[in-house]
Swiss-Prot record:
A9 repeats lie at residues 489-584, 601-682, 698-777, 793-878, 895-977, 994-1073, 1090-1167, 1183-1272, 1287-1365, 1382-1473, 1489-1569. Residues 67-93, 149-165 have a biased composition (Polar residues). Residues 110-121 have a biased composition (Basic and acidic residues). It comes from Arabidopsis thaliana. GO terms for cellular component: cortical microtubule; phragmoplast; plasma membrane; plasmodesma; preprophase band. GO terms for biological process: cell division; lateral root morphogenesis; response to auxin. Residues 67-255 are annotated as: Disordered. This is 187-kDa microtubule-associated protein AIR9. Residues 122-134, 173-234 have a biased composition (Low complexity). The keyword Lipid biosynthesis does not apply. Gene3D superfamilies: 2.60.40.2700, Ribonuclease Inhibitor.
Length: 1708
């Protein structure tokens, strides 16, 4: 049920906002009083023609009427305005109500919040009700939970059925259809008739009951229909039932008005009040009882003029005050109605909504049909629909802030004269606006609104006049400047005020330009204070942003989509002036790509200092990540080079940076990896630091004879010639004396012993600048200990040689110095750690080199000692080269061991010559002692021992050693040979055992291992042992193998072996272990052979031999093996008959032996070669009865392998052949005819009546042929039944046709022909047309003809009539066009007309006159290149005429023409081409001047040029006095724009436009003029005031330059007072402390007095009294200049009749 209800609801529920159509019709229909019309049933015209959908009823209720409808025919009628705008009508009648139930559809839950303004459409199929005449039928019903005004229903609404308490209680019935009806107006939704308005809204958890009117006796019954989401009142749609879209007068609509009784929503008396049309004048009257519980109050069509008393309705949600006498203001009492959602104020006399308070829940407001001049009111935060049609609204000024407004209606207001009003409304309301004046927003208007600057909405609300978008930026700025100019500091003007386009997390800067207008500057400095604010819309309240008080603001993420406002407050001398502001466009979402706004480098660019880079990054919506920084160094004339490791924001300048410019590179990176553009920042060149030195020290031992070195850490650019000094302190005087200079090294002498040595370091840079000297002192210099010099090693550096260390000892007399020897693998001494001891420390200085020192360097540690035991520093002496070794050699070589097979020989030798490496060992065989070098024994190579093998028996054995040193040096080889030959060993058996399966039929082998020389004829014997262990030799078994037989079953087998050497020496006999018992063998087929011929048709059998116990039932299978390996089992018989399927295949026999106990042996198989085929032969050949054109398939049987392509010959013979004549038919004469050489044959007409013979030679697939087989038919070939096919009509000429067909069925006789005519599916025989040809007559036009063919055989057998397919419709000739010609000239603007030239033939003249239909045209244009080969179609140009346009100039035009006749056919394409189009004569069309008509406005000339491409056309602006034909040229004004000035006042501006084509051709000049130029209103007002006073003074600056033609400068201006009255004018020099005021220029307004202005300087004017008295004046602004000029001319006009033309002089 809910699904059906939802469907009904979906089709019926729509908003009342879309229902707004036309206010006149709506007001008239809605305003009719429901009490004045009898209730009748209504059926919608649209609903009547639409299939009704089922209506589901749930919890039915039975409402009752609260009062009866009483209308007296004699009751006096008070004439007053009601909701229809007219007077009430007198209707007499009585209505009855039949007791019926109310059926309504329960609304399904709608998750989308819907309020009344959002409902779009609804439909009522039929409503019927009757009114009860009894007044006292009020009764409360069960509560219905509804949610008034709510936009989201959380529960579906149901209605409970209430049974009537008495049988006399009537009821009303309403049926609701799902048919859609056109929607009604929103503007007058507050003025709907009381019985049709859906005032009740569904409430959750509330009780709604029927309300009885307090004046039941005189007023009609009050009820309302049910609104379930979107049911609209049938009365609201009265015009819908008669065609909603039609418009008519109110009277005509009234005649169709049908009033329905209202259906009561079960609203309780305490929640609902309906007093419509009760002439109530005050809400505080005694008879009106307003309750705080009321939620639905309907007070329309009364006489209320004040809202006093309405404040008690603090819970009201729907308030209808339409069609009363409210004039406003006085809406303050509504402030207490916080729950109000819908307010209807239509049809009153309201002039202003300024007093309407802010209603936090108001969603719908109707103020249509009032006298509002503007929509100024308090902000309504939830208002969605504002209906303000039929008012007097003229301006958008003070438009309220409506943040969620969706629908705005302002039809029939003067405001509609504003161009692009819809775009202005979009700007004021914002993106929530969906509909304007009952239409969806126009895309064009939305696009136009986007072109306006951000401050447009604010300016509109402040009263700015809406203008074109391209002028809006300048116009709104001027508007704001005009508002601000009086609040700015004195002398300051605003030059600019705008904000950059804001983007997320990117700097947004404001631009305010204030400059001084006055030339005299003040000493006070102007400062600007800033404050940024943010708001959702430009008209909403801006909220200041905390700490956003700078010129630049960085929008945050929460600012996206919002509007920024920057307020700039001028401050001068601690005085704050009113702020000015600028509005931004909505904040855009950042692109996520960061960018660097600025880079700064801090730090002094001096060597050793730290500089730091700081970046200001706009992250543009990205999350800051780890950015990439790097430092680069750039030389003066080089490119930047990256500094390795310098990747931090801080960098310490080093020596390498001196003279270079540092480059800081910064690349912003977000966390997501998005990189911005890298930015660079260059520094100045780095300077070197002043020279200095630190960490000065002395290295070396302070001992006599040692060398001291002074060192220090230099800093300060590149080091230059620094100075060094060595000083020694005098022991007696303590003074320092210079002992060395210019070097950093000093060798201590005997004089230095016991003193301190001082080292002085004076740093100097490369430029010679010296720094502060730094000094340091050494420790006390000590005397030198004993020391060895010139130490060296003497002797031969070879293995086992003696060497000696020598040296000179200083530092006293040498005592028992000690020497210790080492070896070292390095040729350079690197300390004690790399030395390896060879001896202990001894006094002896000689040493014999051991073997371990070979390859090493010899090191001697020489420790000098004095006789008193003082030791000096040891000295290490390294030999010049490494110790060499002797060449490798052997000092002895021998072989020990027994020379017998199996014996082991061992070789030993003595090696000398350094460390032995991998010496080489080899053993050799020698047949004799002189057999050298012998045969190498490979397996013994590299071994010192050799085990003699059998191969060495009888041979000598030798051993050879090749000494090899560890360095790879090879010595001389040396050999040693055994003294005797190798003897063989005694024969013996190493191992013996029986090998093989102990099964009958298996071959056993004796596996043995012999040793003892070469084996001879050893002896084997086999033994059989029974179960009691008694062995028995097996006779004849004397070999190494034995085949088990049946006799061995159950016994054990063993073998004996007696080894015999080849020299017949015998060894002991060995017996193997017994093996057994022997078991019976597995059944086996030892042989298998085929018997028989392997040819197709032969029988194949086999012969098999069996072993393995007693034979049982053996298995066998015959298998066919195909060439592809696939096997097919054929049979299991003892034989196989070969067939055709076996030919070429192999036959395999599988034989499985089976023992009698059922044990199966291994299958054995044999296979044949391919089975050969038999000789080919034909076994059978038959020919069935033959008939013409019926294929004959003979029946044949072949044998002899696979049949190949045999030879078939069909013969035709008139007589039947027999015997040899038949078998030898191939030799027959001409009476026999060969017909075919295929197996199958189809008899033809020639074969009818003859016999057919088939000659067949059977052929095998390999080409071998058999004997031929011949057969003849039993009877002659019979003819076929007569028939005809392919019956068709062939067109001979345009008016002649021929019938054709293909006859079949024996020989044709006199066949019959006929012709038919087909028209609209009816086929009629054409009389007299019985031949094969037919000539078309006029009766055949637009018809089709058919040809009929009845076949007749020669024997008079008649066949079936066959008809051809209908021809195409017989039509006359297609219209032809001889040629296509043009009328008109190929000139821009001219009209070309295509005309056809008709052929003069009679038939074509007839066709064109009688059968011509439409003619289609298509125009084409060639490309710009002028290529006539290709054209582009002009899709819209499809008429015979074409007006040549501008874009056609220089191109060729082509027109294609196709003529269609009345039969739908088309002629061949005809076309005509033009020459290249020439441009038209230049002219200007629709010339006009645009401008607002004041002397301060900008005027522009507009017109449409015609005549090719416009060249340098001439424009001249002129003035014209009203009523005078004279024109005064304005010099220099030849542009399309003209800025008017004060000299134009009272004149018409005239522009003369002379069009000139680009090739110089000049057209006729055209002029346009304006209305007389008026004074700008503000200036006019000011001038009138001054003229009325009669005495005016101005403070001006006077130009005292003696050369007035020069440009006025600021330095030659002096202050003067300009005084004027109605009679005279004078220029007065003000007085000072030293002088009185003096009059410099005085004069009256008589001729030649005049005032001149200067177009190049709008602040300057010249007053000319006469030829000798004139003065140049400079004022502060153009405005003041214009006021002065107009005031002077105003005074002058009274006394001077001179035409103003002589007064308007312009400086050129």
């Amino acid at each position: 049920m809910e699904e059906v209800a939802a469907k009904v609801e979906e089709e019926t529920v729509e908003t009342n906002v879309d229902a707004v159509k036309e206010d006149n019709a709506t007001i008239a229909n809605e305003s009719r009083s429901p009490e004045s019309v009898s209730a009748v049933s209504v059926v919608s015209n649209r609903a009547a023609s639409t299939k009704k959908k089922p209506v589901i009823s749930s919890n039915l209720i039975k409402p009752t009427a609260s009062s009866s409808l009483r209308v007296s025919g004699t009751t006096p009628v008070t004439i007053r305005r009601n909701s229809t705008g007219g007077v009430t009508e007198n209707l007499a009648g009585t209505s009855k109500v039949l007791p019926k139930q109310v059926s309504t559809t329960a609304s399904r839950t709608d998750p989308v919040r819907r309020s009344l303004p959002e409902l779009r459409k609804s439909s009522v199929s039929s409503l019927s009700a009757k009114t009860v005449s009894k007044p006292s039928l009020s009764e409360s019903k069960k509560s219905v939970p509804v949610s008034p005004g709510s936009r989201s229903l959380t529960k579906s609404t149901g209605f409970s059925l209430s049974k009537p308490e008495s049988s006399a209680r009537p009821a009303m019935s309403v049926s609701v259809s799902s048919k859609r009806a056109p929607s009604s107006s929103v503007d007058s939704s507050g003025s709907r008739t009381s019985s049709g308005r859906l005032h009740s809204t569904l409430t959750s958890g509330r009780t709604v009951s029927k309300v009885s009117s307090p004046s039941a006796g005189s007023s009609p019954s009050v009820s309302s229909s049910i609104r379930s989401k979107s049911f609209s009142s049938p009365l609201d749609r009265t015009s819908n039932f008669s065609g909603r879209k039609k418009t008519s007068t109110p009277e005509s609509r009234d005649s169709r008005l049908i009033i329905l009784p209202k259906v009561e929503v079960k609203a309780g008396d305490d929640m609902r009040l309906d007093l419509r049309g009760h002439r109530i004048r005050s809400l505080t009257s005694g008879g009106l009882h307003l309750s705080p519980n009321l939620e639905f109050v309907y007070l329309r069509d009364n006489l209320l003029s004040t809202l006093e008393g309405i404040e008690i309705l603090n819970r009201v949600k729907v308030l209808d005050l339409s069609f009363n006498d409210f004039k406003g203001p006085g809406f303050e009492p509504l402030e207490n109605c916080k729950m109000l959602q819908q307010l209807y104020l239509a049809g009153n006399q309201i002039t202003s909504l300024a007093s309407l308070p802010q209603l936090p829940n108001l969603e719908f407001l109707s103020v249509a049909q009032n006298k509002l001049k503007s929509l100024a009111m308090a902000s309504q935060p939830r208002l969605q629909v504002l209906a303000a049609s039929k008012n007097k609204i003229t301006t958008l000024k003070d438009f309220p802030y409506l943040p969620v407004l969706e629908h705005l209606r302002v039809e029939e207001n003067p405001l509609l004269k504003i161009s692009h009003l819809e775009a202005a409304s979009i700007l004021l309301v914002g993106p929530t606006l969906k509909k304007f004046n009952d239409r969806d927003l126009s895309r064009e208007e939305v696009a136009i609104a986007k072109r306006y600057p951000p401050q447009t909405a604010l300016c509109l609300r402040e009263g700015w006049e809406f203008c074109k978008s391209d002028l809006a930026a300048e116009s709104t700025f001027r508007f704001l400047v005009e508002r601000w100019k009086d609040t700015l500091p004195s002398g300051y003007l605003i030059k600019e005020a705008h904000v950059d386009r804001p983007s997320e997390e990117a700097p947004c800067q404001c631009h305010f330009g204030l400059f001084q207008e006055s030339p005299t500057a003040t000493d006070q400095e102007l400062a600007l204070k800033f404050q940024w604010s943010v708001a959702d819309r430009s008209l909403s309240n801006f909220v200041p942003i905390l700490n956003a008080t700078k010129e630049v603001y960085w929008p945050k993420r929460e600012d996206i989509g919002k509007i920024l406002k920057i307020e700039c407050t001028p401050v001068m001398a601690e005085t704050e002036y009113p702020s000015i502001f600028a509005i931004s466009s909505p904040v855009q979402r950042g692109k996520g790509i960061p960018k660097v706004v600025s880079l700064e480098l801090n730090g002094e660019l001096v060597e050793g200092n730290i500089i730091k880079g700081q970046a200001v990054v706009a992250w543009c919506g990205g999350t800051p990540g780890k950015c990439i920084t790097s430092w680069l160094r750039r030389k003066w004339n080089g490119s930047p080079v990256v500094i390795d490791g310098a990747e931090d924001e801080e960098y310490m300048l080093s020596l390498d940076d001196v003279g270079s410019s540092m480059v800081f590179m910064y690349t912003p990176v977000t966390e997501g990896g998005a990189r911005g553009e890298p930015q660079y920042k260059y520094t100045e060149f780095v300077k070197a630091a002043p020279p200095s030195v630190s960490n000065v020290r002395i290295t070396g031992d302070a001992v006599e004879g040692c060398v001291l070195k002074g060192v220090g850490d230099y800093f300060g650019g590149k080091e230059g010639p620094s100075k060094f000094e060595w000083l020694r302190k005098n022991k007696e005087t303590g003074e320092l004396s210079l002992i060395s200079a210019g070097t950093s090294e000093y060798t201590l002498t005997q004089e230095d012993v016991g003193t301190h040595v001082t080292f002085v370091y004076i740093p100097a840079n490369f430029e010679g600048l010296e720094g502060e000297p730094v000094s340091t002192s050494s420790s006390v210099v000590k005397p030198a200990p004993p020391k060895v010099t010139d130490a060296k090693i003497v002797g031969d550096l070879r293995e086992n040689s003696k060497v000696t260390v020598t040296g000179t000892v200083t530092g006293g007399t040498e005592g028992s110095s000690r020497v210790q020897w080492f070896k070292s693998s390095c040729s350079i001494l690197e300390g004690d750690n790399s030395l390896e001891e060879l001896s202990t420390s001894k006094v002896a200085k000689s040493f014999r080199i051991p073997l371990g020192a070979v390859g090493y360097y010899i090191v001697a540690k020489y420790t000098p000692m004095t006789p008193d035991g003082e030791c000096g520093e040891p000295v290490y002496v390294l030999s010049e080269r490494a110790v060499e070794t002797l060449p490798p050699s052997l000092n002895f070589l021998s072989i020990t061991g027994d020379n017998i097979e199996g014996g082991i020989l061992t070789a030993s030798y003595g090696y000398i010559g350094g460390h032995e490496g991998k010496s080489k060992y080899e053993w050799h065989y020698h047949k004799a002692e002189n057999d050298l070098p012998g045969a190498l024994i490979p397996e013994a190579s590299g071994l010192l021992q050799y085990t003699i093998t059998k191969e060495a028996i009888g041979k000598f054995i030798s051993f050879q050693c090749i000494p090899v040193r560890d360095d790879g040096i090879v010595g001389e080889p040396r050999s040693c040979m055994s003294q005797e030959r190798v003897r063989p060993g005694n024969p013996s058996t190493v191992s013996l055992h029986v090998v093989g399966a102990l099964v009958e039929g298996t071959m056993l082998s004796a596996e043995k291992e012999y040793w003892g020389g070469e084996e001879g004829a050893s002896v084997f014997r086999w033994f059989r042992t029974n179960s009691d262990g008694t062995p028995c030799e097996i006779k004849g078994a004397t070999t190494s193998s034995y085949l088990l037989s049946v006799g061995d079953i159950g016994y054990f087998i063993s073998v004996s072996y007696e080894p015999v050497r080849n020299d017949r020496a015998r060894g002991p006999t060995a017996i193997s272990e017994i093996a057994g018992p022997i078991v019976a063998g597995h059944p086996n087929c030892q042989s298998l052979e085929f018997l028989g011929s392997m040819i197709e048709g032969q029988r194949l059998s086999f012969v098999a031999s069996y072993t393995g116990g007693m034979k049982g039932n053996c298995y066998l299978e015959w298998v066919r093996v195909k060439n592809n390996g696939v096997k097919e089992i054929l049979s299991s018989d003892e034989f196989l008959d070969l067939s055709l399927d076996d030919v070429g295949e192999s036959i395999e026999l599988i034989y499985t032996p089976v023992r009698e106990d059922g044990i199966e042996g291994s299958p054995r198989s044999i296979r044949t070669d391919g089975i050969a085929p038999a000789n080919p032969m034909g076994l059978e050949l038959l020919i069935p009865d033959c008939c013409e054109k019926q294929e004959v398939v003979p029946h044949k049987t072949y044998f002899g392998g696979h049949e190949g392509v045999g030879e078939y010959i069909w013969y035709r013979t008139k007589v039947k052949l027999h015997g040899s004549a038949l078998t030898e038919i191939s030799y027959a004469g001409e009476e026999v005819v060969v017909c075919c050489r295929t197996l199958k044959y189809t008899p033809s007409l020639e074969d009818v009546g003859a016999y057919l013979v088939l000659y067949w030679i059977p052929t095998r697939v390999d080409g071998r042929s058999g004997k031929p087989v011949v057969v003849i038919t039993n009877s002659p070939v019979a003819p076929a039944d007569p028939e005809v096919s392919n019956v068709r009509v062939k067109k001979l000429f345009s008016d002649a046709y021929s019938g054709e067909g293909e006859y079949f069925g024996g020989h044709e006789g006199p066949s019959l022909f006929s012709w038919y005519r087909e028209n609209d599916g009816t086929i009629d025989l054409i009389d007299g047309a019985n031949s094969k040809t037919y000539e078309v007559t006029e009766s055949d036009y637009n018809c089709r003809i058919l040809f009929g063919y009845t076949p007749v055989r020669s024997d008079s057998v008649v066949g079936e009539l066959k008809m051809s397919e209908p021809t195409e419709i017989i039509l006359p000739e297609v219209p032809k066009v001889d040629m296509l010609a043009f009328t008109g000239k190929a000139v821009q603007g001219d009209v070309l007309t295509a005309v056809q030239v008709i052929p003069k033939t009679e038939i074509q003249q007839l066709v064109w006159s009688k059968y011509k239909g439409d003619i289609q045209y298509q125009w084409f244009r060639s490309p710009e290149s002028g290529d006539k080969i290709s054209y582009e179609a002009l899709s819209s140009e499809i008429s015979c005429s074409y007006k040549v346009r501008f874009e056609d100039i220089g191109r060729c035009l082509k027109c294609e023409c196709v003529v269609h006749d009345v039969f739908g056919r088309s002629s061949e394409l005809a076309y005509a081409e033009t020459d290249p189009i020439s441009p038209g004569f230049p002219r200007i069309e629709k010339l006009e001047i645009e401008g607002q008509g004041f002397h301060t406005n900008l005027y522009a000339v507009r017109g449409n040029y015609f005549g090719g491409k416009e060249g340098k056309s001439k424009i001249q602006w002129l003035r014209s006095m009203v009523g005078s034909p004279d024109l005064i040229s304005i010099p220099g004004e030849t542009g399309r724009m003209y800025e008017a000035n004060v000299d134009d006042v009272g004149y018409r501006l005239v522009v003369v436009y002379t069009p000139i084509r680009e090739d110089g051709v000049q057209g006729h000049p055209v002029s346009a003029s304006t209305e007389p130029v008026a004074v700008e209103p503000d200036i006019l007002k000011e001038v009138r005031q001054k003229l009325e006073t009669g005495l005016v003074k101005f403070e001006v600056l006077c130009d005292k330059d003696p050369y007035p033609k020069k440009i006025v400068g600021e330095g030659n201006l002096e202050r003067r007072m300009l005084e004027m009255n109605r009679k005279r004018i004078k220029v007065v020099k003000p007085g000072s402390k030293t002088s009185f005021a003096t009059t410099e220029v005085r004069g009256s307004y008589g001729p030649p007095f005049h005032v001149e202005t200067f177009r190049n300087d709008q602040r300057r004017l010249r007053i000319v009294v006469d030829s000798e008295n004139e003065v140049d004046i400079v004022v502060q602004s153009r405005h003041l200049r214009d006021v002065i000029v107009l005031v002077i001319r105003g005074f002058a006009q009274r006394f001077n009749s001179t035409s103003l033309n002589s007064l308007l002089k312009i400086d050129t």
